[in-house]
Structure formats: structure tokens, C-alpha cells
Amino acid sequence: MERGWIAEKDTVNVPTWDEYKGAVTKTQEYAYDDYAVALVAKELGDEANYKLMMERSNNYKTLFDPSTGFWRGKIDDGSWIQDFDPYYPYYQYMYREANAWNALFFAPHDPEGMIKLYPSKEAVEAKLDSLFSEPWRGYEAHNLTGFIGNYCHGNQPGHSIPYTLSLIHISEPTRH
């Protein structure tokens, strides 16, 4: 994690069952884990590790691609993976049991920082609207069920996504 992200191998025509790293998902989840460790360090009075882990908790931002508005994988040299389809359920490649849509908005420890990655709150709202309104493309992956558009309620990391609307002061849809 020296670079702040886990590298994935660059490949094309990725099968959903091959052995990959799930690098985007792991980078996001490790950032959340680092935040939790930072809180423990702070509680123990370990200021040095608190600061280190809080800094590392921002690593999720290293894989945000502003040109697509998605978290996206990188290869070893730091360039974006070129064969990128936000609708494809890579299963292990870049995302674990997910696609780029399902990985949207996973930064439960830093929702405000995540929102700031977008150019405006309106851009966040538009992306959220697209998540729920863009039709699922019918890709088959046995762990992905319970869709509303591309929002997959059957995948735990997405359960907090609807509440992102309330963070941009749009609470009406989250009441339903």
C-alpha cells in the first residue's frame, strides 16, 4: 500500500471467475479499516499512529477517476486499466462481487471527503440518480441480486448508498 492503492494486472476480456485481487474494493475497504485502527490509536493516546492511519484512510481517493466518476483499477505503473466497463460484474477483477456502480459511494468513514471528489453536489445527485435508474445490463453473477437499476441491495457494501442523498441535503427519496 505504499502507493495508496493495490495494483491489478491489466487484461482484456476478463472472466468473472479468474483469480484477481479485487483491488478497487480492497483499497476502499482497507481505507475504512485504517480509519478504525486510527480511532483505536487515538483512544490509546498513540498520536503518531493515529495520524499515520488517518492519512492512510484517505487512500480510497487514489482510485477515483474524475473523468468517469467511478472508482477504477490501476495497473502497476499507476495508469488506469483501459478495459473498463462500469456495468460489467468483474466479481474479482477490480471489484469484489461487484461492478463499478456497486462500488460507488463506499467511504463510510469519510462521506464528506468522498462527496468532494465530485465537482458539485448536483453531480453527486446525478450520479446517484443514474445508479438507481440506469438499467442492469443482465450480466449473470450469482452473488449479485436485488437490483434497482444498478443499485444492488443484495451486496452489503451498498446498503448505505441511499443515505448519501441525505448528506447532500436531499432526504425525500431516503424516506421511501
Set out the residue ranges of the language-model regions.
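Active-site cavity-forming subdomains of large catalytic enzyme subunits
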Residues: 1-60, 64, 70
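Short, well-ordered coil↔helix boundary/capping segments
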Residues: 24, 31, 105, 152-155, ...
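Catalytic cores of carbohydrate-active enzymes
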Residues: 38, 42-158
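Residue-level detector of conserved catalytic or cofactor/ligand-binding positions
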Residues: 166-176
